[in-house]
Amino acid sequence: MPTIVSNNEVKKVPNIKPLNTGPLNKIQFSNIIFPFGRTFGPKIFGELAQKLSEYSPNNNGIKIPVPGEGLPRVINYCADQSGCAFWRMIWPGDELLANNRAVIMTLYQMVTLGQFYGGIDAVRLQRQCTEPQLEFIKFLRNVSDQMKQQTGKGFRIIWEVDDIVCPAVDIPDYNVCKTAFEGDTVYNNVKEMMKYVDEATVVSEHMRQHYKKHLGFDKITVIPNYAPKSWIDRGYDEKQLRRKYNRKGKPRVLYAGSGTHFDVTNKTGQKDDFGHVVDAIIKDITIDKKYDWVFFGALPMKLKQFIGKGIEFHPWCSILDYPQKLREMDVDVSIAPLQNNAFSRSKANIKLTEAGMQGIPCVAQNIDCYNSDGWKYLFDTAEEMFKKVDQILRTENSYMEACKFAREYSEKFLLQDHLDEYTLLYTTDYGDIKRKENASFLKNNPEQFV
């Protein structure tokens, strides 16, 4: 966001050294023009608003507010550019910006210029676990503390994670990403980081309990994965759903997911998230032939031989196209098997909401990530999975009931309805009474207010 200042004012900005290159107790922050048009000292938003009004040819004496005036100001540091970053960092930031609820800057490159953080309310860092990232968090703590000492206001430092990254023993061996987190270094780095952050955010209560136990850190807040309506909502058409149910041919059953769910290197002998259901699927493909199977993104190694022979496979696509692709596949039901382990139990519920917003009911594993919020189509064994699919598809009425349930459940997780949870995260301390006044924040984090 540009800052409108005169040339004379720009010349008045002193040549200040970065915080990491000079004596911290000698650095003056007053009268420095900071990012996002914010200043300490005599330069305040009211003056900038006045200047903007002077540039308007038809203001008739009415003050024109600076975009973002008085809003929380946040810097996001992302660890990836895939789904994790979009769900946890990019989409919330974009939605807050678009609705004029906060001013968010999303970055990947670490910025070690102290003045850059002037006027910031919070810095949120995604899945930081390396030694350089630890040093960066120490730097941020130092900058925030010095700003608070000199100006009365620092910024909050928030560590964000949406998966189990430590201890490595709790990452399944079949997950090909495990090698990046093995050994003691990552675990020790993350434990050390907790000494310097104000709060951590996770996707689920089970994940909160996991990190509380293993990191010895209590200030952990649950913010579920909320989806932007503009991305996930492609409409809900009951006539189309009825047409799909009554079409000729076998019902179409979908699995959509990444290769991290499968033993792609054969490290565990195919004992992965599909280990308990894959043989039953093969039996249906080769003998019973009751369903058509659709896999989107990846599939178990045992099923590769059936591509084009009972299995329809679609490679991964741009995340922007993902909801529309789900609709175009014209599937009736989706499934979400998981191995019952700490990693799986801590997951978010996006398998339910991604399909559910399209009116596609999901038959999901009966573990914490899916059974803790009222979802009713659950299974433990392969036999139960098939029974639940049959139950949904038994009649047109049972199918429409399941589609409606899936849609209504998913609508509870639209990002536009949960922006206050993010602004509270950025502007209030852990356990602040203002958080308790937000019904969703209280529901997901009752322990903060005990």
PLM regions: where:
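N-terminal pre-catalytic "stem/leader" segment of glycosyltransferase-like enzymes
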Residues: 2, 11-131
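Acceptor-binding helix/loop patch of EC 2.4 sugar-transfer enzymes
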Residues: 15, 158-187, 230, 235, ...
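Conserved catalytic-core segment of nucleotide-activated headgroup transferases in glycan assembly
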Residues: 80-95, 226-328
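Membrane-proximal helix-turn-helix segments that form the acceptor-binding/catalytic region
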Residues: 142, 146, 165, 179-200
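Donor nucleotide-sugar binding/catalytic pocket of nucleotide-sugar-dependent glycosyltransferases
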Residues: 195-212, 216-238
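Nucleotide-sugar-dependent
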Residues: 263-272, 320, 324-357, 364-374
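A charged, aromatic-enriched C-terminal amphipathic alpha-helix characteristic of glycosyltransferases
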Residues: 397-431, 435-437, 441-442
